[in-house]
Amino acid sequence: MVDHITDRDRRYTLFMLVVVFTSSHVDRQIMGILGQPIKDSLQISDTQLGLLTGIMFAVFYATLGMPMAMWADRNNRRNLISFSVFLWSLMTALCAAATNFVQLLLMRIGVGVGEAGSNPPSHSIIADLYPPEKRSTAMAIFGTGVNWGILIGFLVGGWINEWYGWRIAFLVVGLPGILIALLVRFTVKEPPRGYSESLVPEVAPPPFWSVVRYIWSNPVLRNVVAAGTLTAFSGYAAVIWVPIYLVRIHELGTGEAGTYLALTIGAGGAIGIYLGGRLADYLGEKYGEQWLAWVVTIAGLLSIPFMFLCFFASTSGMAILAYSLPAFMGTIYVACSFALIQNHTPLEMRSVCAAINLFIMNIIGLGLGPFTIGLFSDVFASSMGVDALRYALLVTLVAIAFGSWFYYRTGVWVRRVRGLTQT
């Protein structure tokens, strides 16, 4: 740990955390563009595909995230992130050797175990580097890793699959992560805790269940966790199943589908999350912190009709065009949620609060989102045939609607809480 962080150190650390977050989402989301070829090659069902991309990955990813976050609140966060990148990258590369469902499932669980140690300490480091008035923008920049990961995963994975097959695609995206792990370990500085706010922890990090009780008793945290979880349910389900929908129903190749989605979800979504974070910081500073939540409410409600049009489009062009707006705004919630949680959490609880939020978000969002769509698709298939996937995807619209409501409630509570603290 160092005692002083320069502006250059701050920018470089954030850049490397974005690279790490990008790598995790390349390795996580590549299953979306490779889903149909893997299904055909290994002869698995949509439910099994949902298990690979959802709940089995998420259970280990989310469950191990909490003890790793508690460790990070007491020890070196940079070293934990470095080890995590190495592990998930190795397990992604090993997916290339899988010859059946069980083997691939075990490799994907390994990816989840590796990724469990990255996000909570990253959030904590960013909170130490950037003060509250700049935190939404910093979290937005960090959150663009989701979209850059999708861009690289879909673009590289889609075309490598068409040229060399899905196994080589796993090798190509997995192995570079080992270099990233080394760069984090030897070039990133561990910042002092509370550095951005000139604070030091007044007490030792509290026990886990004390943090759980704190979150439950805090209406802002309670509502933003519910809101983010429901929005993540829709987002994770869509990012896995929309590529499969385009390949299966609209008969696009994985390279073509990956290119279109890399541009819409990847590049468009990255711009959206960054601008959303900047807008949230601007509105929050000018009109009140509640706008960090209300920006997401507006984005969610605007997305619903366009997603419906996407799922029932008669051509691939219409589907991709309709999906462009939801893709642009779909990850705005990431920066705003992360910033609100850090803003309303005591210094000594930040990593664990982030981990608890991610646990719930990932078990329900990442875990049940893709799995639920796969299950419904199999259930509807006997009566609807190939169109079963269209109707299964409607579940995502319900999740967005409820998520938008909880973001609205979050903003209401933020306004009340800030009003009380100022009187």
Feature annotation, model-predicted:
Residues 183-187, 304-306, 310-313, 394-423:
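Multi-pass alpha-helical transporter architecture, strongest
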Residues 142, 146-186, 190:
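Helix-loop-helix hairpin linking two adjacent transmembrane segments in secondary transporters
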Residues 2-6, 192-225, 249:
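Juxtamembrane intracellular "pre-TM" segments in multi-pass secondary transporters
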Residues 34-63:
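Extracellular/periplasmic helix-loop-helix junction of adjacent transmembrane segments
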Residues 31-32, 219-274, 330-334, 338, ...:
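Extracytoplasmic gate region of multi-pass secondary transporters
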Residues 43, 76, 97-103, 131, ...:
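Helix-breaking motifs and short loop linkers at transmembrane-helix boundaries and internal kinks
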Residues 107-148:
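Cytoplasmic helix-loop-helix junction between adjacent transmembrane helices
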